[in-house]
């Protein structure tokens, strides 16, 4: 077994923000920039090499090459280009737009509204922050426009799920932490085991298995438990449940957002998008069987994503309780001796439901 530590990489969002910062500095200082420093959302500082700088009167262009580390990411090596332009004596505003190789959202249910460029909220926020940082002392009113492009983005997007999700014409600018963690199932499951061991060793009677960081944050806000009690299981639901059962954890809380809980409810023990598709047809059948939700069957069949269904139904309480009850049923099948609860985290940091 190799002892090599897997190398982290950077998200397209982090690379785009770095390229924007470099182009903004070039525009402000009227000089070339070869490297920029960036504080990532996860709190880690990072340095990015800047390439292809071109400077004209009111425009500046450059690009950053995405390094995905040891993660098998199709966008590894992609060039994230940015062209910055400034128009003086206009309304003070910052415009972020997509160009060649950046997709547009055509279906509901995603974090970005239909019709918008597929630049997700966290990368967009990062970009706004670096622009405000660079032009903090700007006195003359001006419109700053940043055009983000990926030359081969449309071709690369064919290797992703973008088209199925309704993102057409290219890639998405993604990321919530700024870093890409290498996918290593063995490393991840080893971490789950170790985390559960630590929780028990620290006296935890309840272990919270979170599908992601956003869900974990919601759980931490609402549960008065020690830090060690929170375990990031990621997509490894089945493994994490069996780990808790084998270690005789008294109580387990499964915390996740709606789309992940739908996957678990459908019986998928591994919930990564490449290994289990969200089975909205199954959900439609469940809705049909319950009088309070039968009228939503067709909506489920026509939904683009599970999140789309949740939002389109107006966060229907009966739908939420149905999915959470199905998750409890699956948990009982996987680990029948463990006391279980399910927490549904919203997409905006709120708690939507917590089973009794």
UniProtKB/Swiss-Prot annotation:
What InterPro entries does the record tag this protein with? CbiD, CbiD_sf
EC number of this enzyme: 2.1.1.195
**Under what name is this protein listed?**
Cobalt-precorrin-5B C(1)-methyltransferase
Q: Which Pfam families match?
A: CbiD
Top EC group: transferase
Question: Per the record, what are the reactions this protein catalyses?
Answer: Co-precorrin-5B + S-adenosyl-L-methionine = Co-precorrin-6A + S-adenosyl-L-homocysteine
In what pathway does it function?
Answer: Cofactor biosynthesis; adenosylcobalamin biosynthesis; cob(II)yrinate a,c-diamide from sirohydrochlorin (anaerobic route): step 6/10
Q: Which Gene3D superfamilies match?
A: CbiD-like (3.30.2110.10)
Q: Keywords in UniProt for this one?
A: Cobalamin biosynthesis, Methyltransferase, S-adenosyl-L-methionine, Transferase
Presence of keyword Methyltransferase: yes
Question: Which family is it part of?
Answer: Belongs to the CbiD family.
Report the GO molecular function annotations: cobalt-precorrin-5B C1-methyltransferase activity
Q: List the GO biological process terms.
A: anaerobic cobalamin biosynthetic process; methylation
Does the keyword Membrane belong to this entry? no
